């Protein structure tokens, strides 16, 4: 775990220690709190002697996301008790169910746009973010959002849920893309650890086909038009890195039949035994699917990826979102 993350956790533990000490003085039977206070002191001591974050059995590093969830963790996954392993499995299954409820409805049309997405976690939970958010009813605009949170596992899935809540709250204010992303960046930066960030690609589309796209350090969205394919490169850094970051926006006009394809690096950085899938292959598939409906577009990519992998396992979350102007 990098030093900035440990410094942030140390600050949390010191604050927790002060609050526990105050509470212990105020209650009559503080035995449980004293035990917790001892655990906090032990964690701070491990930070001082350089053993914090190392499993007390095998001395290998404890998974970062688990330390971020519980800074008092002493054992890696391989050395949890049977009871702890079962509890972890139950927590993961519950987290997966909750995450699935946050996904938008699929294979739908909304205000002149058709969309379809593919959402495939590498494990039970995902750090990918996929959403379709309506602005106020009068404006007839939709936000199509895809993102990839740093890290993996439960910690990343919790940050994905955080993004979901932020954007659903901010969308009700009827902001343009620029202001939306800047506010989201500031909120995300102020409410998470300094090591947390998320790439994002956000499309604001209106009924007439006008779109605004902001790419915050994400894989380049593709505008798939009849005679050309346009890559929308990054117009800013991932959100959460710097609280005062600025983000550029590109504007386009799409005609009926034009599409936008968004994806996470689970596609472009997928590997078989010999090579990476790569952005060039993403572009090559796009050339072949210009006239496809959104569901067919996604199927073309999943089929091509399966063929490319040739039995190799996927190692990262995979999300793809296709949008088409009707």
Where do the protein language model's features map onto the residues?
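Interaction interfaces in information-processing and related assembly proteins
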Residues: 1-49
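Short, cysteine/histidine-rich loop/knuckle motifs that typically chelate Zn2+
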Residues: 56-58, 78
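Short Cys/His-rich "knuckle" micro-motifs
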Residues: 65-71, 85-88
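Regulatory cytosolic signal-relay segments
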Residues: 77-128, 220
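PP2C/PPM family metal-dependent serine/threonine protein phosphatase catalytic domain
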Residues: 111-126, 181-191, 219-250, 279, ...
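Acidic loop->beta-strand submotif enriched in PP2C/PPM serine/threonine phosphatases
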Residues: 124-127, 133-134, 198, 232-274, ...
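Catalytic core of PPM/PP2C metal-dependent serine/threonine phosphatase domains
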Residues: 154-233, 247, 299, 309-310, ...
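Active-site-proximal, acidic helix/loop segment immediately C-terminal to a metal-coordinating Asp/Glu
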Residues: 155-173, 254, 259-312
